[in-house]
Amino acid sequence: MKSTLQELSLKEIIFQFRSGTLSSRDLVESAIQSHKEGLGAYRDFRRDAALEMASLADQAFRCGTDLGPLQGIPVSVKDLYGLSGTRTYAGSPKALPGAFEKEGPVISSLRCQHAVFMGKTHTVEFAFGGLGVNSHWGTPRNPWDANTHRVPGGSSCGAGVSLQEGSAWIALGSDTAGSVRVPACMTGCVGLKTSFGRWSLEGIFPLSPTLDTAGILTRTAEDALLGFCAIDPAYQGRQAELMKEVESLEPASICISTGDTNLWDGCEPGIAEIVEEALGELGRAGVRMVESTVSETEQAIELFRIGSVPGIELKEFLMSNLPSWIETADPVVGSRIKSSSSVDAGEYLRRLRVLKKLASDVQSHFETVDLIACPTLPISPPALAEVSAVEGYAPRNVASLRNTVVGNVLGLCGITLPVGLDASGMPVGLQLLGKHGSDAKLLSMACRIEKILGTSRQRLGIAPCFK
């Protein structure tokens, strides 16, 4: 069972901090008590450091200093981000050189706001995988199955678990093919992938400079909007403005395309049905639903299946900067790096040209619709035992990223909202993709949609591991 503090939304916490009815230290102590070692969310859970940061946030409040909406808020950090005072491993068995501890703009912004860093969450090695498997450190447990160890999604594999257990309200992640949205979906959370280039990647271990984006996982879409406004350079301090837009947004002003059948085909039992039911609810509430062909999605999926560019770029980076780390790579990661060896420079450049053209061509689709909707994942989180070996891992990894990678390849912003449970009792997500640069619009519409459909807690209930 969770404490009353754990039930508070980010908006409620922000208000209570400023009204003096709640302290950051009390909230952080609750977060520490909620942490469950057995779920394995963190590589480095920093109790003492978090309490010290909470005390600093409280002291600032007492002095009348308000540094931003995330002041005093518990935040978990994916172990790709440089964070002063703790080593960066990027999912590897040995720490990366000291240069990878340097903080980038995202972390620096949160530190300036006196956000509370709870620790480093686990990641798939080098962020190169969608299921969340890590043989070096152990794979975090998906809290939605109390009997079988199921994967939590990756590569930000500890992020969603940290939110569900209650040790954080914001989880920092990264998304190259779905690494924010996949774990958010598999653990019943909200996951925001920002538009490519919107947030600085400085201070974050690079998987693919061509496709990497920073993002956040939260418990609700409203929390995601507030987190976005705390981090995004163009929207810092504008959370009230966006919240007002949400309140005035009429359902009929939202137009959603259900996209091509390739985003719906092959879904495991209960997934497509749950998403269709959610879209039906939106339609009955007045949201305009249209069927339209988005041919670029099929081309994006095909490019991903033949390899796209992340594997090529990761191998080059490792060979140039961390050659000895290749030798100790997790088998499920090493096999993918190895498969990139056969791609020559000409093919790599061809793929870059295709990426650029697809991202350009798809923009015209958003002249008539606001969002593209589909299931976030076509599969249910598999049991860890089924994907521990390369043979079982490879096809499930491809399937887990099939729908999310479309957002990366086409240069879109995207979000996943939890909308129900599949036939196996595991979370199902509704993915919404928006035009490049329309992140604030996407979040506003996601919040309005959440008001119609309900939050994760309202639609999914409590994860079995916490009952």
What are these regions, as identified by a protein language model?
Residues 1-52, 284-286, 458-467:
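An N-terminal boundary/leader segment
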Residues 20, 72, 78, 112, ...:
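Glycine-rich, small-residue loops and helix-cap segments
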Residues 21-29, 55, 269-293, 319-324, ...:
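Acyltransferase
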Residues 31, 50, 224, 256, ...:
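Residue-level signal for inorganic ion chemistry
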Residues 40, 169, 370:
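Conserved acidic residues
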Residues 70-93, 251-255, 308-359, 375, ...:
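Short helix-loop capping/hinge segments that flank enzyme active sites or metal/cofactor-binding pockets
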Residues 71-214, 259-261, 374-393:
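Short glycine/serine-rich loop/turn segments
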Residues 165, 169-258, 262-264, 276-285, ...:
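Structural helix-boundary/capping segments
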